Amino acid sequence: MQAHPARVGFALLTSSPLIAAAVEMSASRILNALAGTYALVNTSSTQNWVPIPDAVYGSAPVGQLIYTASGFMSATITATEPAYRPAVSFPYKANETDAAWATVGRHSIGYAGPLAINTALPANLTHGQLLHGPLTVANVPTMVGVSQVRNYTVIRTREDDVEVTYVRIGSERGGGFRGELWWKKIA
């Protein structure tokens, strides 16, 4: 049985087997609490902390985020505006243009891979830092093999007398760009 990529290195982070076990148990407990399927509620982008329009996903994106307790994840987000989603089909048809497909690709993202808690930083059931990866699948080729760092905050609230869980995911995108995504747990 091959070691889970997200778990490799725990012993290197600690000097004691007891500490290593505590780190693993804590990370495992957090992954278990985060496990589920989430629907995208909204996104926002900033550059150098100044709000900017989200040029990638548009003004009304849809998406799904899946975290498993065993340490895997999948994320998909796409724009919904017709200008960003030409009516192409899968498998592609001969009359569909590369330009139409490029537009779809430019305004969507999909990736999957291991999921881990960054144990080098404080983390608990409500906030910390996740590592999406190293990614094994991505529609953007340069993302394969790379880990995406994501800060998380879990918010539980009541809506219509039902407990609802939201996860806010923050990501640094380089060049002063930052994204914040809100996800609602649906399963």
Regions found by a protein language model. Give the residues of each.
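Lipid interaction determinants
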Residues: 17-110, 117-187
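Fungal secretory targeting signals
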Residues: 1-24
